[in-house]
């Protein structure tokens, strides 16, 4: 290092320490990027810059990484630990050539690998981004630009508190040397590849250049599809082309986002304060997978579950803090009220009407706008359920936006399109009380400013929030597998709907929802709610509750539901203490200790949180209930019974297990029960351990309400095999409501007609009903008999009496 460089860096350190507050992506690069600290490390930066180097130094050392300014010793040679891929421009001109000293360092490092077969230098590309404002569409400048001295000083002053230091996956120089050789040409190639990589990093962090809104409208109005729709509108309404075009412009103005980086940047500060006030922390998982997709140039479509209006803000906030661009979000037109509407719009929301069936002009404009977002490379987010879940369960997907996504691909997109399922979980959903009222028949209140103000008054500590990114679904690959000749239907005009579209979209929607549930996050409140609701009086002693949570944790840890689901790291006792601190339970103390219970209103609210994770326990709960209710069971009999019931659970709860894996899963679950000493397993036979049967009983009760619903429908079919779809759904709902009143079942979804509708579809798929709705009575009787064996006698009696009264 020259003395001049050393002096200038020492001068810069003090002002930079005051003016720069960097954020690192990822926050824990050593673990997230699998950096091996026992191997030599070299940092690669895009441009020669002492400011960037010193900023990197501060962040690297705070993370436990080597100091970029410390010398690198390899086999007796002392080398720089950093390399610049391009020179720094000056006010007199720009020199983008790769610096000679950088090429020399690359060449020397590659040569050292040639001489030492054990050597493996890790190169870590690192980008220092000063602000993340996207460019303007009319600009032809590159995404990542070098800055001269005055420009860099201005950037530090303007964006020093918004500085992002982004570490990329390690590049093994051992691999480069072995695969490509060690001469200077390879060193040049390595530098060129790094330059492309840095440009992609900037694009992933800032997003594509933004158009002016009116320029976008003008471009859309010239699209052949919209021009044709305007002509058709003019003819059908007998109005002038100018008036129809004005209508089209008004629709665009209603729909289109007006993204503002300034609002996002300032909004981030407000949201950081808000999350700190509301939540004790946010847990984010698997974000690195999404970052890789963004950096590799994928068109990303986020498809989160929808629990709360908070979802809009939370996911954008998390993505921004994970170094990615907040997406353009499809929001219901009901949210376009003052002042929320304009704020959401400038934060990236575009608004969609609840229904636009029969409105060709609107549907064409919306489809063209969505295709434009995809074509320009903006990430998009839409809620696949169509609205917020009032029960806490994942709803059946609305497929309209998914179909339009595939239609956009049929326009000839030149980038891969990938769905990213997102599970969002909370320990408190602020609308949950409203949901319970709506499910009891109260009319939904229209969103307005007054509602927002009333909600803000309720803000308090809501515990923890969770954002888990699920396994991505690459649509190009999916279409190649399920519609191999889909590329033949590519049409630049758009709007085509090939015959394969509907079945493929329906299958894709089910896969998407399954991947969302796969990424579920169990937490203190959902686990405690599950346990308390399984007890007969909605009450457990503190010790029993801790014991039950311990049972759940072992099940989830030893037999993980999926690779993307998460479980708490705290002990059962710590989780119970945390759940109690959320002030949702009744705590009473007697001479033997604390009793934790739910009153009636709390029981209804707690079903929401239980339903968030009920799918995680569906199979273990079903097996437990069989063991509790059926005697002299063998492993084979359990496997047979599970195979009969599982298709209904799979459809209703979006379970990911494949039918061919069920037998192995049953064995693994039984082994875990035995390990927890809930049962004694002797080869093919098993029996309950009576000295430790409470965890098994509580586990089994979690699924009983679902089995009761199935039993109602199946026994109705046995009694009335000629029942049609609507009659079966209505009578099932009537009996479920009666059962709920007589047996204190508070779960709102217990008599939800939509759940019976989903079951009716499964009855057809499993051939209990043929295509004309005729019942296979023998098969239905067998299933109804099995379900009855899993119910408690008093519930079974109520179902029999209710069906008998209908017959009378």
UniProtKB/Swiss-Prot annotation:
Give UniProt keywords alphabetically: Acyltransferase, Cell inner membrane, Cell membrane, Lipid biosynthesis, Lipid metabolism, Membrane, Phospholipid biosynthesis, Phospholipid metabolism, Transferase
Q: How does it sit in the membrane?
A: Peripheral membrane protein
The protein's annotated pathway: Phospholipid metabolism; CDP-diacylglycerol biosynthesis; CDP-diacylglycerol from sn-glycerol 3-phosphate: step 1/3
Q: What is its EC number?
A: 2.3.1.15
Where in or outside the cell is it found?
Cell inner membrane
**Amino-acid biosynthesis among the record's keywords?**
no
Q: Does the keyword Disulfide bond apply?
A: no
Q: Where is it mostly found?
A: membrane
Question: What one GO molecular function would you report for this record?
Answer: glycerol-3-phosphate O-acyltransferase activity
Q: What does the record give as the reaction this protein catalyses?
A: sn-glycerol 3-phosphate + an acyl-CoA = a 1-acyl-sn-glycero-3-phosphate + CoA
- Motif HXXXXD motif — list its residue ranges: 306-311
Q: Which GO terms describe its biological process?
A: CDP-diacylglycerol biosynthetic process; fatty acid metabolic process
Q: Provide the top EC class.
A: transferase
For this protein, the record's Pfam families field holds: Acyltransferase, GPAT_C
Pull one GO CC term from this UniProt entry. Answer: plasma membrane
Q: Which cysteines are disulphide-bonded?
A: none
In which domain of life is the source organism classified? Bacteria
Q: What's written under domain?
A: The HXXXXD motif is essential for acyltransferase activity and may constitute the binding site for the phosphate moiety of the glycerol-3-phosphate.
- HAMAP family assigned to the protein according to its UniProt record, in alphabetical order: Glyc3P_acyltrans (MF_00393)
Entry similarity comment: Belongs to the GPAT/DAPAT family.
Name listed for the protein in its UniProt record: Glycerol-3-phosphate acyltransferase
Q: Which organism is it from?
A: Vibrio parahaemolyticus serotype O3:K6 (strain RIMD 2210633)
